[in-house]
Amino acid sequence: MSEKEKICIVTGVGPDKGTGAEIAKIFGKKKYKVAMIARNKKKLNDLEKKYKNIFSYPCDVGNLEKFKKTLKKIKNNLGPADVVIHNAPSASRGSILKLNPDDLELNFRVNTTALLHLVRETLPSMLSQKKGSILITGNTAATRGKSHWGFFASTKAAQRILAESIAREFGPKGIHVAYFIIDAAIDTPRTRPYMQPDKPDDYFSKPTAIAEEMYKTVLQDKSTWSFRVELRPFGETW
């Protein structure tokens, strides 16, 4: 009897060389069938054509009803997920006196409520197998509220606490939940010119390295599971 194909779902997959794309690619290389979820259909389709074992499922995770339908479609097409990775962010920046309160709700919906639905749609199958991995991409905003980042930070903190609650409830049942706090500027074609164009390479975390750490976490022995995983470049002040 042949071994069941492993299935991975990744939200927030952007352009090639970005974190989401690198996560999808490394799991695809490891023989997972990877369902990529993001709003940009063209970018997903381009990745699907270029790399093996990764499949395009365009969807805005902030549209919760469509997101749930997409997750059901993935299960019907590929099978129940063994690994799910919530990488989709919504990040509003600005003074709390000026930001639209609707943006706070949007940040919460993408960062936290979408995680809840991702887990609810995929966890039952994991529980039936008594194994599975749920990984979440976070950052230092989940641990502190900096000026002008109140909307983003408050919803990422909620995301982290939700993830911890899921880990405490379902870890004893064989489900590994890990929250990645990425304390770094990530080296992507979009981030480098926008944030710190003159910084040396050592200032940035590489998307490929982040993806590799996520894959390593899935392989951890049950006797040494991580929950809070902090990643930063060696030169980062903290």
Where are these regions (language model features)?
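A short, exposed helix-loop element centered on a Lys and neighboring polar residues
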Residues: 119-120, 164
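Canonical Rossmann dinucleotide-binding motif of NAD(H)/NADP(H)-dependent dehydrogenases/reductases
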Residues: 2-34
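Conserved NAD(P)H cofactor-binding loop of Rossmann-fold oxidoreductase domains
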Residues: 87-93
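The beta1-alpha1 cofactor-binding region of Rossmann-like NAD(H)/NADP(H)-dependent oxidoreductases
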Residues: 58-69, 101
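C-terminal helical subdomain
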Residues: 172-175, 179-181, 196-238
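Catalytic loop of short-chain dehydrogenase/reductase
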Residues: 12-14, 133-158, 164, 168-171
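Substrate-binding pocket helix/loop in short-chain dehydrogenase/reductase
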Residues: 95-96, 100-105
